[in-house]
From Swiss-Prot:
SUPFAM superfamilies: MurCD N-terminal domain (SSF51984), MurD-like peptide ligases, catalytic domain (SSF53623), MurD-like peptide ligases, peptide-binding domain (SSF53244). This is UDP-N-acetylmuramate--L-alanine ligase. It is found in: Cytoplasm. It catalyses: UDP-N-acetyl-alpha-D-muramate + L-alanine + ATP = UDP-N-acetyl-alpha-D-muramoyl-L-alanine + ADP + phosphate + H(+). Pfam families: Mur_ligase (PF01225), Mur_ligase_C (PF02875), Mur_ligase_M (PF08245). Its EC number is 6.3.2.8. It comes from Yersinia enterocolitica serotype O:8 / biotype 1B (strain NCTC 13174 / 8081). InterPro entries: Mur-like_cat_sf, Mur_ligase_C, Mur_ligase_C_dom_sf, Mur_ligase_cen, Mur_ligase_N, MurCDEF_pg_biosynth, UDP-N-AcMur_Ala_ligase_MurC.
Length: 491
């Protein structure tokens, strides 16, 4: 970015006073990396630390950021401000050093709020669907030539990045309720996709507390702002009278302001109509499978329509939507060894969903788009607390697949909880009589175990939020063929 471009940008977003060098602790996370990328492109000096390199840190390095793969006090001493992710503990040596040096230490959402402060902010909140909905809104605004800034929690495939600095007043961002930090944001428009019990440790196990926090978030909208809310969700519907702001509802429900009708799925695409108040009927082809993605698209259409974006721009963006990383992410269709003389192949899909509702939506999308295929799922539970709190829901949802490979729980720093482990979950599913899960304690053996159960016309769902994405990429690299010991040795 040249000096002239930077000067023009400063007329939209005033420079943060006395801030020159911004340091991120936990910079490799998607949400942190996205904000760091926008700030790097605004001309700030960026540094950060994390435990290991990943695509996010590699990309930031290419933008000129200084990345350390260790946490040491000296990393922060030149910083104007330190931004910290929720995964970082207060006794981290960089946090301790920053506080001792009287360097401000802020959470990720505070920096996002600062980026949003002088822009027209569109914040996407909810338990599920945030990342995809944020990407859809961003895609529509880009298609309309509005050149938005966006900060997303997942890879926006069309842009090849989690975040992008635009030249306009629009900032589209995912709003994270996991630590209640979305309360820092003060957007002009807020989407709420749904509200379910998740991250309940943040809310003292009190669902009423979680609901009130969403209301407080919506009250951050100015009185002339707008809440776009999914009326199909019973909790969202219950909260509507308490919002006290202009509201547009969306969903399949008859009383939705933006109503989805005549939904059908053909392979990876959804086809439906949208009825809007005082607007012509919109016939949509969406390049994303599942009714849940039709809901995400309806939210994006509601926001775009309110902003006055032309229908043709909306329709082009949705038909050409390239999706986001690890959200029903198609990794390939691979030929398999013949079974009983019949040639076969298997489709490989990687998905981040790790809550029973998300897993259920992914399975339903797979069944609707490919009804003749067996669903073979490789599932990694995420966190012992979530497995404990939603144990029966997981058992019910996972029982819907045809073949289930279960990895050990990805702890995410939590201590084990008796009875909330993968072996117990496998036993519960087995005892219900629908399915005999295969427990895979060594994730390195997934290619071998999977090869033994595939039969030539399968859809493989690699499902979870831990490190299972690496397994999906490994399966794609191997084209579903397990390595021999000799190949492993020479690889």
């Amino acid at each position: 970015m040249n000096t002239q471009q930077l000067a023009k940008l400063r007329t939209i977003v005033p420079e943060m006073r006395r801030v020159r060098h911004i340091h991120f602790v936990g910079i490799g996370g998607a949400g942190m990396g996205g904000i760091a990328e926008v700030l790097a492109n605004e001309g700030y000096q960026i540094s950060g630390s994390d435990l290991a390199p990943n695509p996010v840190t590699q990309h930031l390095t290419s933008l000129g950021a200084q990345i350390y793969f260790h946490h040491r006090p000296e990393n922060v001493l030149d910083a104007s401000v330190v931004v910290v992710s929720t995964a970082i503990s207060a006794d981290n040596p960089e946090i301790v050093a920053a506080r001792e040096a009287r360097i401000p230490v802020i959470r990720r959402a505070e920096m996002l709020a600062e980026l949003m402060r002088f822009r027209h902010g569109i914040a996407v909140a909810g338990t599920h669907g945030k990342t995809t909905t944020t990407a859809m809104v961003s895609s529509i605004y880009a298609e309309a030539g509005l050149d938005p800034t966006f900060v997303n929690g997942g890879l926006v495939k069309a842009a090849g990045t989690h975040a992008r600095l635009g030249s306009s007043r629009y900032l589209i961002a995912e709003a994270d309720e996991s630590d209640a930090s979305f309360l820092h944001l003060q957007p002009m428009v807020a989407i709420v996709t749904n509200i379910e019990a998740d991250h309940m440790d943040t809310y003292q196990g009190d669902f009423e507390n979680l609901k009130q926090t969403f209301i407080n978030f919506l009250h951050n909208l100015p009185f002339y702002g707008r809440a776009v809310m999914c009326i199909d969700d019973p909790v969202v519907r219950e909260l509507l009278p308490r919002v006290g702001r202009h509201i547009t509802t969306y969903g399949f429900s008859d009383d939705a302001d933006v109503q989805i009708a005549s939904y059908r799925q053909e392979g990876p695409q959804g086809h439906f109509t949208l009825k809007r108040l005082d607007k012509p009927l919109m016939t949509v082809t969406l390049n994303a499978p599942g009714r849940h993605n039709a809901l995400n698209a309806a939210a994006a259409v509601a926001v775009a329509t309110e902003e006055g974006i032309e229908d043709n721009d909306i329709l082009r963006a949705l038909a050409g939507f390239q999706g986001t990383g690890r959200r029903f992410d198609f990794l390939g269709n691979f030929p398999l060894a013949p079974v009983n003389g019949k040639e076969g192949s298997a489709m490989l899909v990687d998905d981040y969903g790790h809550h029973p509702t998300e897993v259920d939506a992914t399975i339903k999308a797979a069944r609707a788009g490919w009804p003749d295929k067996r669903i073979v799922m490789v599932f990694q539970p995420h966190r012992y607390t979530r497995t404990r709190d939603l144990y029966d829901d997981f058992a019910n949802v996972l029982s819907q697949v045809d073949v289930l490979l279960m990895l050990d729980v990805y702890a995410a720093g939590e201590p084990p909880i008796p009875g909330a482990d993968s072996r117990s979950l496998c036993r519960t599913i087995r005892n219900r009589g629908k399915l005999d899960p295969i427990l895979v304690s060594d994730s390195e053996t997934v290619p071998e175990v999977l090869a033994q159960v595939l039969n030539g016309d399968d859809l493989i769902l690699v499902q979870g939020a831990g490190n299972i994405g690496k397994i999906a990429r490994k399966l794609a690299e191997l084209k579903l063929q397990p390595q021999t010991k000799d190949e492993e040795h020479h690889g």
